[in-house]
Amino acid sequence: MEFIKLARRRGVVADLIHVIFNVIFAGAAIYLTIAFESLWPAVVLVILSKWRVLAVRPRYWRANFLSSLPDLIFGIGLVTMSWGCGRIGVSYLVAGEALPVPALAVQISLGVIYSLWLIVIKPRHGEAMIGFQALASQFVGVVALFLVAQGMPLTVFLVIAFIIAFASARQALGMFEEKSQGLLATIWGLLVMELAFVSWHWSVFYLATPLIRIPQLAIILSLISVTAFRVYRAWQDDRRVTWDELG
């Protein structure tokens, strides 16, 4: 009985340390976007946090990297959005205009979201949560991509769009015994890349806050992704799709 109590205490302590570490990490990543004009220190920190990808035999590196890609995209996306808030805030100050919303408040909110992602969302492995993780990483990744798209070569922009979509689709399909997982994820990546090419020339944005712009493509892709996932899941269940299953 004492052994069980001791094990429980150690489990609680380990969970508490895990929470504290992730809160500190998320705060540090956001802080770097505030302290430096460059985005790269925060991006490097997020990348270094995935060191465990390489803490295995080299033959497992590819599989580990692909499985960690959605989390990496979400983290880089959030710090990019935080960095963008700071840059937009500076442009307001240079123009002599008052900020409608304090940039620091938005950046802290992004830090809270990142903490919740690391502590609550990322560890979950249920079908609904994995689907949400895939959708969230794609949405945040696309929003961040358009934030830094200005001045970026079109080829680089399209390659990043493909990687974001491929990683999201691969994670969502990973819940099923799909032999063509890589092929289907590649097809989705190519489709998103084509839509991104159109959006590169004709972009529409919506203001989530005055400091965060949501590209129309991110919303459209989310709607298509949810519909496609429900169709795929219904087809996997009984090889037929009904309107009730899509509802």
Language-model region placement:
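Hydrophobic core segments of alpha-helical transmembrane domains in multi-pass membrane proteins
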Residues: 39-49, 103-110, 155-166, 213-223
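Hydrophobic, membrane-inserted alpha-helices
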Residues: 21-29, 77-83, 137-146, 163-170, ...
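C-terminal transmembrane helix-loop-helix hairpin of multi-pass membrane proteins
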Residues: 2-34, 180, 184-186, 195-247
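N-terminal topogenic module of multi-pass integral membrane proteins
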Residues: 1-120, 241-247
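C-terminal ends of transmembrane helices
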Residues: 49-65, 113-126, 166-180, 227-239
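Internal transmembrane alpha-helix with an interfacial aromatic "cap," most often the third helix
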Residues: 85-95, 105-150, 165-175
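Hydrophobic alpha-helical transmembrane segments in multi-pass integral membrane proteins
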Residues: 81-91, 141-153, 193-208
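Cytoplasm-facing juxtamembrane segments at the starts of transmembrane helices
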Residues: 13-14, 18, 62-74, 120-140, ...
